[in-house]
């Protein structure tokens, strides 16, 4: 996007003052590279001229967008640009505009409005002026795209005292308030107008439309005056209408009553408008721009907790040229935008379908078999309405199949195979229903000639009829090669053989537009035969349990590695006799290379091995009912089956145990919630159905993986509850969805408060829905627990413990349930246990979602104690039993969207090239490529996108490592905001982004701000996981070190102690991790003037290092040195204190009791040296000099001994550094 120097004061200066005189030279030098240069834009109104920084590769529409968003040119929305008197096409690049160069002047010319333009202008101004109000959005829900970054930073900046910091009085083991993830209350923005709305006289009659009337508006200014305004093709003017008289023609008023922009017209009508609008802009500028930036190419995150209350275009992009980099940028940018637009439109339509607001095309069919077309998008239910999946598991199989189909289409879109097209596809889960939305493939509804199949390639009617078409072979061959699919035979119902490139379930359709479409990609990988054959007890709900694409890729890499090693061994054996000396020399060379380049010998051999002879592909149709006919076919089929079995065995014997071991050893980041756990499993190629097996493996590892075991069990319970809730929600009338969810949540999470909850249903409303399914009313806590246990056993083959519901982490479970069902709950302190419910005699929230029900209840109780009998309504409310959730707590249910949008391959290629260059020590080239990747990410995705957040995060770490701290902080800040808005204010990624930002802020000298970020991250951690997360050890250590930097030694000590407590519980008291923290804690205790405790902790650290690492290890030696020094100082201080105590006793005998105990113990911020200052010279050999040296020793000050300096350097760097690394385990 074009860059502007949009400050108002700049635009008032002359162009000569602003323009860089060297720009012309820069343009000439960088012409080929699309260098930046500056042009002027002449405006019809103030400020009459602005300067815009542009690139020759940008399009004119980018310049347009910059003008629309610039504060000084807000009023322009309907205009075109001219250069040398000729209109410029918005969609050409600036380099294609004849004669345009640095310092050229283009002219903005206002255009006549259409009704669309007028409406867009009014909507834009309502948003700019803060008069838009809250729009009900069925897709994004309440507070979608929320960011808390600015309020966290503001809280840190509000600490006035030097000794104030965010972690003061922080309760480390305590619970976190739910307010942590709610938007902070803000002062209301300055009001510019009271209202802008459509007039009751709108729309204009036909005869006035012919005269150019577009809309009639009604504006009420801050002064209280009401104006009726006509939107005309020429602009806006005040008309003669009143509330009772229609006369939409211009009114003669003292002031000028017309303008091309509504903004300018309001400015003329309201004397206070300009000042109020300027104040509003200043208020908005206090926020980070990213927190208010509109979403373009991604769906914003909808928080689970809120404050109480087009087909052809998708295919056309694939046919765009891709020869040059600019072609690819334009193509991927357009693809990203079109997918985002399609996904949003499809999701909105899916919600309407789920709500029953779209008429079906086949209303006489059963509900699950009904199909819909809305907004040119084809919708159906993810259920087996016509019996297609009858043998695979019916509705369960159909639901899984459509989810797998989206993943398959996404993989094909990512491969971007020339000549192969996919329909735009989206799956939406909403109110228990799964809806599939697809762009209509041209020809899919076409009636074929007799004898012709509806499908041109693949299975036509299940597997009974198989079609082949030579045109599909080349494109399917490319697809199969990329996805490791083996070409194989299948047989139809007549046992006729057909050779297919893909699964028989994958279909090819030749569209009437001449394009080749691939459909039904839910079986691009083989069935997990090991899982299907392992059934004991009730059968798994469906037979769609396939392997993940990530696992197939991992298996391929493992087999390739085996092939390379075998090839190397074969070569060595062949050459061993004839070239022993040469081989020895070669091995010597290899060993040198191994030392210098840190590469394994196998990797070097691998570089020399030609892997073109290696091939591995899996047959996706084995174990799915195919019957080979000849002996040769049977033999080949048996080999295919063996290969698939080996892949399944690879998952169970290699991948899953490796993951558990990596988590045990701390080699991977520990998951925090269900979302991060699922991402970790999917990345490794592990299906969610293996949660039970993983839980068993984790339990075998003991207490170190107790947190993982808890998380795995919680995830199984949440997913079982989701399936149960969806079953009830599916047929519940929409007005009762909140009652259904609240009742089921009460049965799961509120049974301790009320063992017999009853569903809250409006009986008069219920009568309107005689066919509604209200079976959820009959659910009891006991029945729900039994059903959850059954579902966990059925789906995950894991048996929950008998009292599993007593060990639930209620808030974390509620959060995961809300996220998986799309619930948005009213924020309040939910009552989960009897202890919390004690004293509550009334319903916690009786009248709404304000989150103040408990406070109101307590006030009512106080009044009753004082003799106030209360109203009859209040008495009735008091008789209601206490329940944890009421229907009013369910503020909204948002749709959960699974899309098939591809990532940008160009941006990822640039990023990967940059990383490789940096690894090769080509720093300048690497940074240029990474910055290019950043530019591509922002151009293609827009700024607000999860992929851009990920890149900001990676780049911030890169800049931090290269010691460019300011850039690191800026990018980390952007990463936080974009992550909050796209993934959620309390997502695991948001926590990691805040922790990163805190480290960078501390490194930049902003330690107080860093502590505010750590405090917020710790609060988020408590909400999404609870206390004692394994990765929190490092965070608490970092907080302690930062507090030491602020000389807050007492607080620092508390955080080290908290870190030690978590570490001991996870790794045991004799682990090296524990010893490292003990080492740091001993230093902190010395700084806090607790010499005796410091000696004890250092001795513990030394003993652990000695037993675990031996006496010669560097850690052991350093701990021993510190122990000697601390012991020496502790003895001196104790001796000193004993002498002072003796003098104090003598004073007591002489009757001077006033000083007893008042100055012996050091106060906060006071050293022992201060206390012992009155001592006599006779004590000089044991005075406070040693403790001062110790303080300097720990803090890095100078001492007289060079030996002490060496010890100091080693201790100040190595143990802490190693400690932070190990503790992160």
UniProtKB/Swiss-Prot annotation:
Keyword Repeat (UniProt): yes
Assigned keywords, A-Z: Cytoplasm, Repeat, TPR repeat
Domain of life (superkingdom): Eukaryota
Signal peptide: none
TPR repeats: 949-982, 991-1024, 1033-1066
Compositionally biased tracts (Polar residues): 1153-1184
InterPro entries the record matches: CLU-central, CLU_dom, CLU_N, CLU_prot, GSKIP_dom_sf, TPR-like_helical_dom_sf, TPR_rpt
GO term, biological process aspect, one: mitochondrion organization
Domain Clu: 281-532
Gene Ontology MF terms in the entry: mRNA binding
Family classification: Belongs to the CLU family.
Subunit structure and binding partners: May associate with the eukaryotic translation initiation factor 3 (eIF-3) complex.
Protein name: Clustered mitochondria protein homolog
Gene source species: Emericella nidulans (strain FGSC A4 / ATCC 38163 / CBS 112.46 / NRRL 194 / M139)
């Amino acid at each position: 996007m074009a860059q502007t120097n949009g400050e108002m004061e700049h635009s008032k200066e002359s162009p000569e003052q602003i323009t860089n005189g060297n720009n012309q030279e820069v343009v000439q030098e960088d012409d080929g590279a699309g260098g930046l240069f500056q042009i002027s834009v002449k405006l019809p109104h103030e400020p009459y001229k602005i300067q815009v920084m542009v690139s020759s590769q940008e399009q004119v529409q980018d310049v347009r967008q910059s003008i629309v968003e610039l504060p000084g040119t807000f009023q322009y929305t309907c205009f075109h640009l001219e250069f040398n008197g000729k209109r410029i096409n918005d969609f050409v690049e600036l380099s294609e505009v004849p004669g345009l160069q640095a310092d050229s002047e283009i002219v903005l010319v206002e255009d006549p409005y259409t009704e669309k333009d007028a409406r867009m202008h009014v909507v834009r101004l309502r948003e700019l002026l803060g008069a838009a109000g809250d729009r009900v959005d069925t897709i994004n829900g309440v507070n979608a795209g929320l960011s808390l970054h600015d309020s966290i930073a503001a809280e840190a900046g509000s600490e006035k005292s030097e000794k104030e910091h965010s972690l003061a009085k922080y309760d480390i083991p305590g619970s976190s308030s739910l307010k942590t993830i709610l938007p902070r209350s803000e002062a209301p923005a300055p009001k510019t107008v009271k209202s802008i709305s459509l007039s009751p006289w709108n729309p204009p009659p036909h005869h006035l439309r012919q005269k150019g009337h577009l809309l009639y508006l009604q504006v009420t200014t801050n002064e209280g005056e009401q104006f009726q305004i006509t939107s005309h093709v020429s602009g806006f003017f005040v008309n003669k209408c009143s509330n009772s008289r229609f006369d939409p023609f211009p009114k003669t008023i003292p002031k000028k009553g017309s303008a091309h922009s509504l903004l300018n017209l309001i400015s003329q009508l309201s004397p206070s408008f300009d000042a109020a609008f300027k104040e509003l802009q200043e208020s908005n500028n206090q926020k980070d721009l990213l927190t208010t930036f509109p979403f373009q190419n991604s769906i914003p995150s909808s928080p689970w907790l809120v404050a109480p209350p087009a087909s052809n275009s998708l295919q056309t992009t694939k046919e765009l040229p891709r020869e040059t980099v600019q072609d690819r940028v334009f193509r991927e940018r357009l693809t990203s935008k079109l997918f985002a637009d399609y996904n949003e439109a499809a999701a909105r339509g899916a919600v309407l379908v789920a709500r029953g607001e779209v008429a079906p095309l086949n209303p006489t069919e059963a509900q699950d078999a009904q199909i819909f077309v809305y907004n040119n998008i084809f919708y159906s239910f993810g259920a087996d309405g016509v019996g297609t999946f009858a043998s695979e598991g019916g509705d369960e199989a159909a639901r899984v199949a459509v989810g797998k189909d989206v993943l398959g289409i996404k993989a094909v879109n990512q491969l971007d195979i020339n000549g192969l097209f996919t329909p735009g596809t989206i799956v939406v889960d909403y109110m228990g229903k799964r809806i599939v939305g697809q762009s209509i493939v041209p020809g899919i509804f076409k009636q074929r000639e007799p004898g012709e199949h509806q499908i041109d390639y693949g299975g036509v009617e299940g597997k009974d009829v198989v079609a082949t078409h030579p045109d599909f072979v080349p494109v399917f061959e490319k697809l199969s090669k990329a996805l490791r699919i083996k070409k194989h035979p299948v047989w139809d119902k007549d046992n006729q053989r057909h050779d297919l490139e893909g699964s028989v379930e994958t279909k090819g359709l030749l569209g009437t537009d001449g394009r080749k479409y691939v459909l039904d990609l839910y079986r691009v990988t083989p069935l997990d035969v090991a899982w299907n054959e392992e059934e004991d007890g009730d059968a798994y709900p469906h037979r769609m349990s396939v392997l993940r694409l990530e696992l197939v890729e991992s298996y391929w890499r493992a087999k390739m590695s085996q092939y390379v090693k075998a090839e190397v061994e074969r070569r060595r054996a062949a050459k061993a006799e004839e070239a022993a000396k040469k081989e020895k020399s070669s091995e010597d060379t290899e060993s040198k290379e191994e030392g210098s380049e840190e590469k394994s010998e196998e990797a070097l051999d691998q570089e020399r091995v030609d892997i073109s002879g290696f091939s591995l592909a899996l047959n996706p149709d084995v174990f799915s009912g195919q019957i080979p006919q000849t002996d040769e076919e049977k033999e080949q089929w048996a080999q295919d089956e063996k290969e698939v079995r080996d892949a399944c065995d690879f998952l169970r014997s290699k991948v899953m145990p490796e993951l558990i071991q990596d988590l045990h050893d701390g080699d991977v980041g520990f998951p925090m919630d269900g979302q991060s756990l699922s991402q970790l499993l999917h990345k490794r190629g592990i299906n969610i159905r293996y949660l039970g097996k993983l839980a068993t493996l984790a339990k075998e590892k003991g207490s170190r993986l107790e947190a993982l075991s808890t998380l795995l069990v919680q995830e199984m319970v949440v997913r079982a509850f989701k399936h149960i809730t969806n079953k009830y929600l599916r047929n519940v009338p929409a007005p009762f969805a909140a009652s259904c969810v609240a009742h089921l949540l009460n049965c799961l999470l509120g049974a301790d408060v009320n063992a017999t909850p009853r569903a809250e249903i409006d009986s008069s409303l219920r009568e309107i829905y005689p066919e509604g399914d209200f079976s959820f009313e009959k659910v009891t806590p006991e029945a729900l627990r039994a059903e959850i246990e059954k579902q966990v056993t059925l789906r995950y083959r894991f048996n929950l413990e008998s009292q599993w519901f007593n060990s639930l982490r209620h808030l974390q479970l509620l959060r995961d349930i809300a996220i998986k069902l799309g619930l948005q709950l009213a924020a309040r302190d939910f009552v989960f246990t009897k202890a919390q419910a004690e004293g509550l005699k009334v319903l916690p929230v009786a009248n709404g979602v304000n989150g103040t029900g408990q406070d109101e209840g307590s006030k009512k109780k106080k009044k009753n104690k004082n003799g106030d009998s209360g109203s009859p309504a209040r008495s009735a409310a008091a008789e209601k039993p206490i329940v944890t959730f009421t229907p009013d707590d369910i503020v909204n249910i948002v749709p959960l969207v699974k899309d098939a949008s591809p990532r940008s391959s160009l941006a990822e290629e640039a990023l990967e090239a940059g990383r490789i260059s940096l690894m090769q020590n080509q720093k300048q080239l690497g940074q240029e490529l990474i910055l290019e990747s950043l530019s591509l990410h922002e151009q293609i995705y827009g700024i607000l996108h999860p992929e851009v957040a990920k890149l900001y995060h990676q780049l911030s770490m890169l800049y931090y490592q290269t010691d460019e701290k300011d850039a690191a902080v800026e990018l980390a800040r952007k990463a936080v905001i974009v992550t909050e808005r796209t993934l959620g204010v309390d997502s695991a990624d948001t926590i990691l982004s805040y922790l990163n930002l805190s480290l960078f802020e501390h490194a930049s000298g902003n330690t107080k701000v860093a502590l505010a970020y750590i405090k917020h991250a710790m609060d988020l951690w408590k909400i999404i996981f609870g206390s004692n997360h394994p990765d929190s050890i490092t965070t608490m250590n970092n907080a302690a070190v930062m507090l030491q930097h602020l000389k807050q030694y007492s607080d620092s000590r508390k955080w080290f102690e908290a870190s030690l407590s978590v570490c001991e519980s996870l790794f045991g008291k004799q682990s090296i991790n524990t010893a490292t923290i003990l080492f740091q804690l001993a230093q902190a205790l010395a700084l806090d003037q607790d010499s005796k405790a410091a000696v004890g902790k250092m001795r513990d650290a030394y003993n652990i290092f000695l037993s675990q690492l031996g006496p010669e290890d560097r850690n052991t030696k350093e701990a021993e040195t510190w122990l000697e020094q601390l012991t020496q100082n502790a003895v001196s201080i104790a001796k000193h204190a004993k002498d002072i105590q003796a003098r104090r006793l003598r004073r007591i005998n002489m009757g001077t009791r006033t000083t007893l105990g008042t100055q012996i113990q050091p106060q906060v911020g006071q050293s022992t040296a201060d206390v012992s200052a009155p001592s006599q010279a006779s004590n000089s050999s044991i005075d406070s000099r040693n403790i001062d040296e110790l303080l300097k020793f720990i803090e890095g000050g100078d001492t007289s001994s060079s030996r002490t300096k060496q010890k100091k350097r080693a201790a100040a760097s190595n143990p802490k550094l190693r400690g932070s690394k190990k503790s992160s385990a």
